[in-house]
């Protein structure tokens, strides 16, 4: 009896995996923190590398059996440094959060202060306070001070930040780390405008490029390391179209502190198969990244304009809505972000609810925030352009503004998706973007 139940669970797992792939073949994926890897990246990720251990730095491993792993990891580091014009790269962090922790560990101690964007102003939970279960506070014990934020311009307020830093110094709360970047990231952050000032107070400047890494690689966003950031952290699977993982970049002087923080501090083995997938993605980004990043930004602007024309309140209007892959929409005229997210999912349109400026003061929380966040990274990699952005905006209008039954749109959404089943901006794309690979 137990054996048959075990086999039933076994079969159920594979059935659900296949159902998921089929669902995404017929959906419009607009999660800003996601992308679709190429078949080549998927091949690297399912390799035997995933079964091996390679603790430490390549050439200095704790384990034997790493001859080819070392070769690939050296190549991965070389490609990462070339892609971002950096002198040092640590490709071992297994996520963007772990990459951030490496910087916290290398350049601060528990009880120190970090300056970062608040979550309603676009900050990521890994930059957050302990009382909010933020990684910086909960795991590393940092005290967090927030940048003053200009809600109209949707970016950090430079003058008020300078004033705040001076006040923090008077109160003996001068930050050790200044963190730029975030999860709601419409426009470049003022790294160039603030870096000299922050460094005059001996702050280590880190730029969390998780969301915009592919745009930076393509030369279509800001260049944080050139503008004054000491280090740059990122995840590798958003606008940079690799597997899930992390990366830390910097100059030679950052090598030893970051290496020690990453291992043995924060990783043992580091998901070596994903490291190989990162290397493939870096090569793809060097070859195709400029064209991809340019199309992403064109699509985001077209999408934002189409949504605005449809009657939505799109944030950042005074600056042209967006300069990244993201669009933020205030949906309070129709419902809240949680309800809109759920309604759109019924139509196979996948978005996420989003806290926006003003939500916390108004008593709204993450489950029922005032906005939704949309991203065009994945649909751009599927080959969509301006006309498709307008059509998707129409679908969203029908569900959210016109209150049409989402399930009645399913056939239209599925028909719309039929022509977009291959990954673009890559060397090889014989396999369908969401094609299920059976190995049994």
From Swiss-Prot:
Pathway: Amino-acid biosynthesis; glycine biosynthesis; glycine from L-serine: step 1/1
Residues carrying the site annotation Plays an important role in substrate specificity: 237
Gene that this polypeptide is encoded by: glyA
N6-(pyridoxal phosphate)lysine carried by residues: 238
Protein function: Catalyzes the reversible interconversion of serine and glycine with a modified folate serving as the one-carbon carrier. Also exhibits a pteridine-independent aldolase activity toward beta-hydroxyamino acids, producing glycine and aldehydes, via a retro-aldol mechanism.
Classification via InterPro entries: PyrdxlP-dep_Trfase, PyrdxlP-dep_Trfase_major, PyrdxlP-dep_Trfase_small, Ser_HO-MeTrfase, Ser_HO-MeTrfase-like, SHMT-like_dom
One Gene Ontology biological process: tetrahydrofolate metabolic process
Alphabetized UniProt keyword annotations: Amino-acid biosynthesis, Cytoplasm, One-carbon metabolism, Pyridoxal phosphate, Transferase
Gene Ontology terms for molecular function: glycine hydroxymethyltransferase activity; pyridoxal phosphate binding
Name of protein: Serine hydroxymethyltransferase
Keyword match tRNA processing: no
Domain of life of the organism encoding this protein: Archaea
Primary location group: cytoplasm
GO terms for cellular component: cytoplasm
Cellular compartments annotated: Cytoplasm
Broadest EC class assigned to this enzyme: transferase
Organism lineage string: Archaea, Nitrososphaerota, Nitrososphaeria, Nitrosopumilales, Nitrosopumilaceae
Gene3D superfamilies given in the database record: Aspartate Aminotransferase, domain 1, Type I PLP-dependent aspartate aminotransferase-like (Major domain)
Names of required cofactors: pyridoxal 5'-phosphate
The enzyme's E.C. designation: 2.1.2.-
């Amino acid at each position: 009896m137990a054996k048959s139940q075990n086999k039933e669970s076994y079969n159920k797992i594979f059935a659900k995996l296949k159902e998921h792939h089929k669902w995404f073949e017929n959906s419009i994926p607009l999660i800003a923190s996601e992308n679709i890897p190429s078949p080549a990246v998927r091949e690297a990720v399912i390799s035997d590398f995933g079964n091996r251990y390679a603790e430490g730095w390549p050439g200095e491993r704790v384990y034997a059996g790493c001859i080819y792993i070392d070769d690939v990891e050296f190549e991965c580091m070389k490609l990462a440094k070339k892609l971002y014009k950096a002198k040092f790269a640590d490709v071992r962090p297994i996520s963007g959060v772990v990459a951030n922790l490496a910087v916290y560990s290398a350049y601060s101690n528990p009880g120190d202060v970090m300056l970062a964007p608040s979550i309603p102003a676009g900050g990521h939970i890994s930059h957050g306070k302990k009382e909010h279960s933020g990684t910086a506070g909960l795991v590393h014990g940092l005290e967090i001070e927030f940048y003053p934020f200009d809600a109209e311009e949707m970016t950090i307020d430079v003058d008020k930040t300078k004033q705040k830093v001076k006040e923090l110094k008077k109160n003996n709360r001068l930050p050790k780390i200044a963190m730029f970047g975030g999860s709601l990231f419409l426009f470049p952050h003022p790294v160039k405008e603030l870096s000299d000032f922050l460094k005059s107070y001996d702050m280590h400047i880190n730029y969390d490029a998780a969301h915009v890494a592919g745009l930076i690689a393509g030369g279509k966003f800001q260049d944080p390391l050139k503008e004054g950031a000491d280090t740059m952290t990122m995840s590798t699977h958003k606008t940079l179209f690799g597997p899930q993982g992390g990366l830390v970049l910097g100059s030679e002087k950052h090598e030893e502190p970051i290496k020690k923080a990453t291992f043995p501090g924060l990783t043992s083995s580091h998901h070596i198969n994903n490291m190989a997938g990162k290397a493939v993605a870096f090569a793809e980004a060097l070859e195709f990244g400029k064209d991809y990043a340019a199309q992403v930004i064109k699509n985001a602007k077209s999408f934002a304009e189409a949504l605005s024309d449809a009657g939505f309140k799109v944030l950042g209007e005074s600056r042209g809505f967006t300069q990244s892959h993201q669009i933020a929409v205030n949906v309070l005229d129709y419902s809240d972000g949680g309800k809109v997210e759920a309604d759109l999912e019924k139509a196979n349109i996948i978005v996420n609810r989003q806290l926006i400026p003003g939500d916390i003061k108004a008593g709204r929380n993450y489950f029922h925030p005032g906005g939704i966040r949309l991203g065009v990274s994945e649909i751009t990699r599927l080959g969509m352009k301006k006309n498709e952005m307008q059509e998707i905006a129409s679908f969203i209008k029908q569900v959210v503004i016109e209150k049409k039954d989402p399930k009645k749109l399913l056939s239209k959404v599925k028909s719309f998706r039929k022509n977009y089943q291959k990954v673009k901006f890559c060397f090889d794309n014989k396999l369908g973007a969401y094609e299920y690979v059976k190995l049994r």
